[in-house]
Amino acid sequence: MPEDVQNRTRIKSERYESGVIPYAKMGYWDADYKLKDTDILALFRITPQPGVDPVEAAAAVAGESSTATWTVVWTDLLTACDIYRAKAYRVDPVPGTSDQFFAYIAYECDLFEEGSLANLTASIIGNVFGFKAVKALRLEDMRIPYAYLKTFQGPATGVVVERERLDKFGRPFLGATVKPKLGLSGKNYGRVVYEGLTGGLDFLKDDENINSQPFMRWKERFLYCMEGVNRAAAATGEVKGSYLNITAATVEQMYERAEYAHAIGSVIVMIDLVIGYTAIQSMAIWARKAEVILHLHRAGNSTYARQKNHGINFRVICKWMRMCGVDHIHAGTVVGKLEGDPLMVKGFYNSLLLTHLKINLAEGLFFDMDWASLRKCVPVASGGIHCGQMHQLLYYLGDDVVLQFGGGTIGHPDGIQSGATANRVALESMVLARNEGRDYVGEGPDILRRAASTCGPLKAALDLWKDITFDYTSTDTPDFVEVATGSR
């Protein structure tokens, strides 16, 4: 028998007689691994159990999220196991911690079904988060290669086409969520939509938990909403819309509601993140065929995205949802009532809007990534914002965003229409100041007060909400060490 064959036989014999061996020695750790352009890369924050070596913990995550089980198996010999094993290739300590590590893992692209987020996530987050070798585990970022991205459709509409359809350019979109979320009759619900749109908003929307309850069935809501939309469009001469939430118990029911919304003229429908990845992709495919904008509410995301040491960072959800094909996703406000560190939110927005991502540790972006011409997904800022913050919102979030003022419209002391007008005037005055080259951030309060001198609804809103803000320390902030650089 040739010597090389004897050597391979000896190695395999030792491997498969060993029963249980460390993951790092099973082939799931390779510090010299050469990355391929087609590799799917994942960055995990790992908190190993006491006594577990960080490299072994990283190898365990690589193994359990790809091909490994708790013992060696002979059937590995029937596969190209050396290729299909995920490879942990780098482990770095997390700055400012003593027990957390960033583990970089590469996956062969052929491990995943084309165009299936459900299959991708079944491996990456499917089983490994319950693994005993790690005390806590968080998926911080991913690089999806060009070749794999090309198997996904991306956003059904995209920001450019949405602006063309709605004839709205040079400023953020304006919207509001109908309040109260639950309990209104269909007729009163439609009245809220009409008044908000007539006052100057582009969109009204359902909230995440309004579906088809005893106090208002879905078809009743859809009809009254569209009556409000059509009347407001006729009165203002502008294209208007209302996000009709088609979320339901089954995908079949969702298709029924989507088709009905389309039939009665809605330009946009809405779904919730909690319906699951397969349902989201299914509705995105429908939306593209029907030429309907698809809005996604991130309902439920904070159950796994908010805690710093365990779960999934929201930037990963942003990437996945852009792949799935949604046109809008709630992505933070910075200044509102919901979690949102400014740098982290910037990273979320860039993941949704840029055509090519560069490594930016301050924004939590750990990989370069080309979006393979997938359309842009519009971020939505919603939750505890009002017109007095307009200069901050424009500065932090830019133009390609939907600013949604729910309480900040419907809570206006003079009514819904006045609340909408206050927001529209505040936005247009701030955009004008920016376009004139003024320091709209520093002069923001003065710009708003000057605009309010000729707009009663804006003055009433500023007097009511003044400088209300939700100033809490974010639980999720970037982990990086600033390094001074000198000029040459």
UniProtKB/Swiss-Prot annotation:
<dbReference type="InterPro" id="IPR033966">
    <property type="entry name" value="RuBisCO"/>
</dbReference>
<feature type="binding site" description="in homodimeric partner">
    <location>
        <position position="127"/>
    </location>
    <ligand>
        <name>substrate</name>
    </ligand>
</feature>
<protein>
    <recommendedName>
        <fullName>Ribulose bisphosphate carboxylase large chain</fullName>
        <ecNumber>4.1.1.39</ecNumber>
    </recommendedName>
</protein>
<feature type="site" description="Transition state stabilizer">
    <location>
        <position position="337"/>
    </location>
</feature>
<keyword id="KW-0120">Carbon dioxide fixation</keyword>
<feature type="binding site">
    <location>
        <position position="177"/>
    </location>
    <ligand>
        <name>substrate</name>
    </ligand>
</feature>
<feature type="binding site">
    <location>
        <position position="298"/>
    </location>
    <ligand>
        <name>substrate</name>
    </ligand>
</feature>
<feature type="binding site">
    <location>
        <position position="382"/>
    </location>
    <ligand>
        <name>substrate</name>
    </ligand>
</feature>
<keyword id="KW-0150">Chloroplast</keyword>
<dbReference type="InterPro" id="IPR020888">
    <property type="entry name" value="RuBisCO_lsuI"/>
</dbReference>
<feature type="active site" description="Proton acceptor">
    <location>
        <position position="179"/>
    </location>
</feature>
<feature type="binding site">
    <location>
        <position position="207"/>
    </location>
    <ligand>
        <name>Mg(2+)</name>
    </ligand>
</feature>
<feature type="active site" description="Proton acceptor">
    <location>
        <position position="297"/>
    </location>
</feature>
<keyword id="KW-0560">Oxidoreductase</keyword>
<keyword id="KW-0934">Plastid</keyword>
<keyword id="KW-0503">Monooxygenase</keyword>
<dbReference type="GO" id="GO:0000287">
    <property type="term" value="F:magnesium ion binding"/>
</dbReference>
<dbReference type="GO" id="GO:0016984">
    <property type="term" value="F:ribulose-bisphosphate carboxylase activity"/>
</dbReference>
<dbReference type="GO" id="GO:0004497">
    <property type="term" value="F:monooxygenase activity"/>
</dbReference>
<keyword id="KW-0601">Photorespiration</keyword>
<keyword id="KW-0460">Magnesium</keyword>
<keyword id="KW-0456">Lyase</keyword>
<feature type="binding site">
    <location>
        <position position="181"/>
    </location>
    <ligand>
        <name>substrate</name>
    </ligand>
</feature>
<keyword id="KW-0113">Calvin cycle</keyword>
<dbReference type="InterPro" id="IPR020878">
    <property type="entry name" value="RuBisCo_large_chain_AS"/>
</dbReference>
<feature type="modified residue" description="N6-carboxylysine">
    <location>
        <position position="205"/>
    </location>
</feature>
<dbReference type="Pfam" id="PF00016">
    <property type="entry name" value="RuBisCO_large"/>
</dbReference>
<feature type="binding site">
    <location>
        <position position="330"/>
    </location>
    <ligand>
        <name>substrate</name>
    </ligand>
</feature>
<comment type="similarity">
    <text>Belongs to the RuBisCO large chain family. Type I subfamily.</text>
</comment>
<comment type="function">
    <text>RuBisCO catalyzes two reactions: the carboxylation of D-ribulose 1,5-bisphosphate, the primary event in carbon dioxide fixation, as well as the oxidative fragmentation of the pentose substrate in the photorespiration process. Both reactions occur simultaneously and in competition at the same active site.</text>
</comment>
<dbReference type="InterPro" id="IPR017443">
    <property type="entry name" value="RuBisCO_lsu_fd_N"/>
</dbReference>
<feature type="binding site">
    <location>
        <position position="208"/>
    </location>
    <ligand>
        <name>Mg(2+)</name>
    </ligand>
</feature>
<comment type="subunit">
    <text>Heterohexadecamer of 8 large chains and 8 small chains.</text>
</comment>
<dbReference type="Pfam" id="PF02788">
    <property type="entry name" value="RuBisCO_large_N"/>
</dbReference>
<dbReference type="InterPro" id="IPR036422">
    <property type="entry name" value="RuBisCO_lsu_N_sf"/>
</dbReference>
<dbReference type="GO" id="GO:0009507">
    <property type="term" value="C:chloroplast"/>
</dbReference>
<dbReference type="InterPro" id="IPR000685">
    <property type="entry name" value="RuBisCO_lsu_C"/>
</dbReference>
<dbReference type="InterPro" id="IPR036376">
    <property type="entry name" value="RuBisCO_lsu_C_sf"/>
</dbReference>
<feature type="binding site" description="via carbamate group">
    <location>
        <position position="205"/>
    </location>
    <ligand>
        <name>Mg(2+)</name>
    </ligand>
</feature>
<keyword id="KW-0602">Photosynthesis</keyword>
<dbReference type="GO" id="GO:0019253">
    <property type="term" value="P:reductive pentose-phosphate cycle"/>
</dbReference>
<keyword id="KW-0479">Metal-binding</keyword>
